[in-house]
Amino acid sequence: MSKLQEKFEIKTYQCNEFGKMKLRHLFDCFQELASDHADRLGVGYEECLKKNCAWVCAKYHVIIDKLPKFKDKITIETYPSKFVGPTGIREFKVFDDNGNILIKGVSQWVLIGLERLRPLIVQNIFDCSKIELEESMEIPLDKMGSVESYNFEEMKDLRYDDVDVNHHINNAIYISLCEDALFENLKQEFDVSEISVDFKKSAVLSDKKVLVKSLFVDKNCDFTITKDDSSVDFARINIKLKP
């Protein structure tokens, strides 16, 4: 099974006050499909536990033509396109009920050993010869710099509800923090055209708080989410808004 598709109907809790799907829940869906597909391909959570390793999401680049709305029926498709060294590339497409592409994106995952927390060569741990790779959309995954100067910052509490099965703050929470900062600054509805994410280190509940630093220039929004004293970057995120 080189591709996995799953149908969704957008629920009320997945939408913002304007009836559009929250970015956080879009990334929730991506995470769930990635996990489910990895299980089916024999490289998922349970197999990783047996080999004392884990997949860690490192990057996303998502291009949004249109966000689904409340009660919309969509299909999300995911597939692997490449394994290189310790990394695997996984891509996503979101279709509307008529088969039109609403959203497309690419993600990079790193296989790490749980004992030393160091990257592992994927081909040395798993037999990937039977995994059929699909052609890549060639969406770039660029390295992102930290926000050094910023025009907005806010301290946010971490909650027990933010923690996932891996015992750290779920990746989608960082997206939600950026959505909050966007609305705090714009005070109105906004449309996102593109999101790039560079996860640097996993926050845990004992961190208690994170600092969200934002730089807004026209339709370009840069975020760095750090430890409360700015000593550690947890995530760097760029969001581009539509005109």
Q: Residue ranges of each PLM-predicted region?
A:
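Hot-dog-fold acyl-thioester-processing enzymes
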Residues: M1-C57, L102-V106, G113-D191
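Short histidine-centered beta-strand/loop micro-motifs
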Residues: E17-K20, K66, D72, V165-N166, ...
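Small beta-barrel nucleic-acid-binding modules, principally OB-folds
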Residues: N52-L67, F190-S202
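Acidic/His-leaning functional-site neighborhoods
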Residues: K156-I239
